[in-house]
A protein has these predicted regions:
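A generic structural signal for short beta-strands and their flanking turns/coil linkers
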Residues: 1, 11-15, 59-63, 75-77, ...
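Catalytic strand-loop segment that frames the active site of acyl-thioester-processing enzymes
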Residues: 1-32
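A structural signal for short, hydrophobic beta-strand segments that form beta-sheets
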Residues: 5-7, 60, 83
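Beta-strand residues in well-ordered beta-sheet regions across diverse protein folds
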Residues: 16-18, 80, 94
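Hydrophobic residues in beta-strands and at strand termini
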Residues: 19-21, 67, 115
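Active-site helix/loop of acyl-thioester processing domains in fatty-acid/polyketide metabolism
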Residues: 32-55
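Hydrophobic beta-strand-centered segment that forms part of the acyl-chain substrate-binding groove
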Residues: 47-77
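HotDog/MaoC-like acyl-thioester-processing domains
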Residues: 71-73, 82-116
Length: 116
């Protein structure tokens, strides 16, 4: 997955990553496979959780994705991740996936990560 950091907002406790969709991610209908979209969320959530965990690593304990619109090949998408709560035993996050060009909301997600 090709991703790069777009924004980091301390006050919002948010981080935004831009992903470029790739040919290997397409499904039989020609759109981006839901598993690839879930992978974008898990990647972005994981980076933020590991940074939040400090000296510890963090692992995914649960994650939920809601697919709202299709994602097409060649589309650049922005995934904005928010830290909902960072405790000692769990880091809770939520995220929103947008079309980078139109700013339309494509998917939402949430999940928890456990510092090890």
């Amino acid at each position: 997955m090709k991703a790069h950091l777009v924004d980091c907002n301390y006050e919002e406790q948010s981080v935004t990553y831009r992903f470029e969709t790739q040919k290997w991610q397409i499904n039989e209908r020609g759109g981006i496979h839901g598993g690839a979209i879930a992978g974008m969320f898990d990647t972005a959530f994981g980076v933020v959780a590991n940074l939040t965990a400090g000296d510890n690593e963090a692992t995914t304990t649960d994650m939920t994705i809601s697919f709202l619109r299709g994602v097409e090949l060649g589309m650049e998408v922005d995934l904005k991740v928010y830290i909902v709560k960072a405790g000692r035993s769990l880091i809770r996050q939520r995220g929103e996936l947008y079309d980078a060009a139109t700013k339309k909301l494509l998917a939402t997600g949430s999940g928890s990560w456990m510092p090890l």
